[in-house]
């Protein structure tokens, strides 16, 4: 079997950033998949499931209620390796196009202090696995270390 595209990225060189992972044609439409890499693969600890689960709930809620992106949001969810998230948007985008949206979204997560949306037994299959404090911290870290001063080296996969 051939490697899938995401396994051909050099994860030794990969740093936290906002990357286009792939673009898929569905009929006449394009769906862009973004790699929102929050930690350095194989260099630092991965995120725990509780904070990732909290970020997933907050980000999905934010995106699906966003005035410009609600109807374009296909999916937001965690990477199996726990170093980041995937965001799928309807449309043909480049990484730099969504940096303002990512800043807005991660500021929302950083500043969120209320009850996590969907964090109940009725709404979620694993509602007890949440950690809002760590989600706030990781969002702040991603903003401060990556998003607020992002450049081309964090927008295009390394060669």
Predicted segment positions?
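Short, conserved phosphate-binding/catalytic loop or strand-edge motifs used
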Residues: 79-84
């Amino acid at each position: 079997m051939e490697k899938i595209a995401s396994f051909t990225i050099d994860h030794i060189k990969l740093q936290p950033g906002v990357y286009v992972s792939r673009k898929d044609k569905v009929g006449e439409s394009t769906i862009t998949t973004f790699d929102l890499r929050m930690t350095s693969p194989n260099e630092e600890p991965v995120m725990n499931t509780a904070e990732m689960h909290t970020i997933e709930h907050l980000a999905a809620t934010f995106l699906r209620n966003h005035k410009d992106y609600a109807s374009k949001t296909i999916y937001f969810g965690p990477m199996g390796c726990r170093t980041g998230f995937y965001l799928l948007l309807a449309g043909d985008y480049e990484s730099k196009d969504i940096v303002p949206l990512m800043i807005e979204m991660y500021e929302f997560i950083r500043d969120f202090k209320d009850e996590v949306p969907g964090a109940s037994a009725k709404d979620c299959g694993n509602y007890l696995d949440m950690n809002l404090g760590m989600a706030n911290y990781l969002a702040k870290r991603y903003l401060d270390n990556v998003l607020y001063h992002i450049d081309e080296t964090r927008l295009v996969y390394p060669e």
